[in-house]
């Protein structure tokens, strides 16, 4: 999705900083999130992504910098007066209330007319695929259903921005994958800007329009998922987002994804490929694929994956210790600059 700025961004952070004593949790970041984006803050634990989300929500006060929501500076504005809602991993539902009362709670506090509350409650439950659940209690629902109730409660009062703090972290893998698809679909339908925090790279790549990669309180890169994965700016991004190979050739550090590397038949030349010889030092069967680790004759080690296909193959599956020829297209090798922005700042 391409965004053309015709109005102020829904979120603008300028020099945003957060200190806890001498610890720098967020180190002067700049960031803009456009209306209607599904924007993800991705990073390891302690990288500053959740602290940034909490400052946007108003739960934490910045140590420096500014936060704008839809063009208005909101420093000092309490959370309940900001045009944002937050969905947490623990759902934060009222167990004694019905699903319908949970969803409509914010509307009741805002003194919305009873008939309008009921209409918007039912509309929100329909959006999250839970029609007919209004009279149930949260304790009668599965984890995925409770998460959808929390989402319905967050969108029912039509916030400008929805903040989601690792909302799928407590779900099992299959349900989490299902909810990723549903969340993206719901976001597209309601048109609300989503800012999503996660440490899960697959989750970020699956759902996001753009991703900001956090590390040590700084932003390493902001890109669309494909650009982030295929053209990482530095070694940290290459290593954190998926699996990557890093080798040095002709004075450059190159990153190559395992799925871009091919096992070649030495007797059959392939035009347009850069090829190198090496030896298989590890073989790991992983169901649909087999993972190989190859020590290259010219230095460096590569990981590559090969689908476990039935039937004849141009190249026999190599055993550990085998001498092999591997190759990749030059455009699939991306040059990276340095290890991280933190290293650049320190130097």
Predicted regions and their residues:
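Conserved ABC transporter NBD signature motif
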Residues: 65-73
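ABC ATPase nucleotide-binding domain helices that frame the ATP-binding cleft
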Residues: 50-53, 149
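ABC ATPase nucleotide-binding domains
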Residues: 38, 77-233
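Helix-to-loop junction immediately C-terminal to a conserved catalytic motif
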Residues: 57
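Non-catalytic connector elements of ABC transporters
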Residues: 244, 253-347
């Amino acid at each position: 999705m391409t965004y053309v700025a015709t109005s102020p961004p829904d979120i603008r952070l300028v020099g945003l900083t957060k200190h806890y004593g001498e610890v720098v949790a967020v180190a002067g970041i700049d960031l803009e999130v456009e209306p209607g984006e599904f924007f993800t803050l991705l990073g390891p634990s302690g990288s500053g992504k959740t602290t940034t989300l909490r400052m946007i929500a108003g739960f934490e006060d910045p140590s420096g910098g500014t936060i704008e929501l839809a063009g208005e500076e909101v420093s000092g504005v309490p959370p309940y007066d900001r045009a944002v809602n937050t969905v947490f991993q623990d759902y934060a539902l009222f167990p004694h209330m019905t699903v319908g009362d949970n969803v409509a709670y914010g509307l009741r506090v805002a003194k919305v007319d009873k008939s309008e509350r009921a209409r918007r409650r039912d509309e929100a439950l329909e959006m999250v695929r839970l029609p007919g659940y209004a009279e149930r209690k949260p304790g009668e629902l599965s984890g995925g259903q409770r998460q959808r109730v929390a989402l319905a409660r967050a969108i029912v009062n039509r916030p400008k921005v929805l903040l989601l703090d690792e909302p799928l972290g407590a779900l099992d893998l299959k349900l989490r994958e299902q909810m990723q698809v549903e969340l993206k679909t719901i976001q597209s339908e309601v048109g609300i800007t989503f800012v999503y925090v996660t440490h899960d790279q697959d989750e970020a790549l699956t759902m996001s329009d753009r991703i900001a990669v956090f590390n040590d309180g700084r932003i390493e890169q902001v890109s669309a998922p494909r650009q982030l994965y295929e053209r990482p700016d530095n070694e940290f991004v290459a290593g954190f987002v998926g699996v990557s190979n890093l080798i040095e050739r002709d004075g450059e550090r190159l990153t190559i994804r395992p799925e871009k590397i091919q096992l070649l038949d030495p007797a059959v030349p392939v035009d347009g490929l850069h090829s190198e010889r090496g030896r298989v030092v590890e073989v790991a069967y992983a169901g649909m694929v087999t993972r190989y680790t190859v020590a290259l004759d010219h230095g460096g080690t590569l990981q590559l994956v090969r689908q476990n296909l039935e039937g004849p193959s141009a190249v026999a599956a190599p055993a550990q210790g085998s001498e092999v020829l591997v190759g990749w297209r030059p455009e699939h090798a991306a040059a990276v600059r340095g290890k991280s922005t933190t290293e650049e700042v320190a130097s």
